[in-house]
């Protein structure tokens, strides 16, 4: 009898853990996207298209905020987000939890956007969120499963019209983290930047790349450089760094001109935000 109890106990713990995981987390079978427009939040599947012609830049200027917002777990996230996004036309958030406080903030600012539902925890969606003062022409969500913890990371591909007639590609990425090698990491990056090599116009690829090792940093840098993108240099550079000293968050671009780039410090998240001011090229 005692042997049966000891054999059954580990099995009970395993099945109990599986049950608890599926009770807390809901993982979509395919990427799901929530579209945001005029204060309304609507569920879409994978891709969204619009007929908008409104340009995302403002008279040739494009101010960008990139920030892993840590699921809004810090009490001062809202005031800092308001401060950091002042004057921005484009916001790329990672680990955004689409709860009531963030929904109200988005609606009050008149933002349009899309969130990729990587997973839901206690029925609240979390994933990358791209917000713009104008709607995108196209937006598609992507997910890549973390091989160890079995929770996906998400990415969002968007296309925005520009005032000079070109189309801007924007990729908002939260890269997989818990991998032994770089295979899953490379696959996620490859899926999202596949269209960049064929795109002759401007592009921005930004987010939390989880580049905590030299192999990861090299993998993403080589692929983006091969697609013609350049990494933004920040000053001051207070980007969040791993114990290896490597920064986790990056902005890459092509077909635009950088006027200012800074990564200030804040305690409103476990990541510091990235602020970049672009202009459209004058010698197109």
UniProtKB/Swiss-Prot annotation:
The keyword Transferase is assigned to this record: no
Protein name: UPF0294 protein VV2535
Similarity field: Belongs to the UPF0294 family.
Pfam families reported in the protein's UniProt record: Exo_endo_phos
Source organism of the structure: Vibrio vulnificus (strain YJ016)
Record's keyword terms, sorted: Cytoplasm
CC annotations in GO: cytoplasm
Entry-linked NCBIfam families: PRK05421.1-2 (NF003840), PRK05421.1-3 (NF003841), PRK05421.1-4 (NF003842)
Major site of localization recorded for this protein: cytoplasm
Subcellular compartments: Cytoplasm
Organism superkingdom: Bacteria
SUPFAM superfamilies: DNase I-like
GO MF term set: catalytic activity
InterPro entries, sorted: Endo/exonu/phosph_ase_sf (IPR036691), Endo/exonuclease/phosphatase (IPR005135), UPF0294 (IPR022958)
């Amino acid at each position: 009898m005692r042997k049966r109890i000891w054999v059954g106990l580990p099995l009970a713990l395993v099945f109990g853990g599986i049950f608890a995981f599926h009770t807390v987390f809901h993982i979509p079978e395919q990427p799901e996207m929530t579209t945001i427009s005029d204060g309304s939040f609507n569920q879409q599947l994978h891709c969204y298209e619009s007929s908008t012609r409104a340009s995302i830049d403002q008279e040739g200027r494009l101010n960008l905020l990139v920030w892993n917002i840590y699921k809004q777990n810090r009490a001062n996230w809202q005031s800092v987000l308001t401060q950091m996004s002042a004057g921005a036309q484009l916001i790329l958030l990672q680990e955004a939890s689409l709860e009531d406080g963030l929904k109200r903030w988005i609606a009050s600012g008149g933002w349009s956007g899309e969130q990729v539902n990587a997973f839901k925890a206690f029925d609240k969606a979390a994933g990358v969120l791209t917000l713009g003062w104008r709607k995108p022409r196209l937006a598609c969500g992507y997910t890549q499963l973390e091989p160890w913890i079995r929770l996906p990371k998400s990415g969002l591909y968007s296309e925005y019209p520009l005032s000079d007639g070109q189309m801007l590609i924007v990729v908002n990425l939260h890269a997989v983290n818990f991998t032994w090698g770089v295979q899953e990491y490379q696959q996620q990056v490859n899926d999202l930047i596949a269209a960049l090599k064929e795109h002759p116009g401007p592009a921005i690829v930004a987010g939390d790349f989880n580049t905590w090792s030299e192999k990861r940093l090299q993998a993403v840098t080589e692929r983006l450089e091969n697609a013609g993108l350049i990494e933004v240099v920040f000053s001051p550079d207070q980007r969040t760094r791993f114990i290896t000293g490597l920064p986790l968050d990056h902005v890459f671009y092509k077909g635009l001109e950088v006027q200012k780039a800074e990564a200030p410090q804040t305690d409103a998240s476990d990541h510091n935000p990235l602020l970049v001011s672009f202009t459209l090229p004058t010698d197109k």
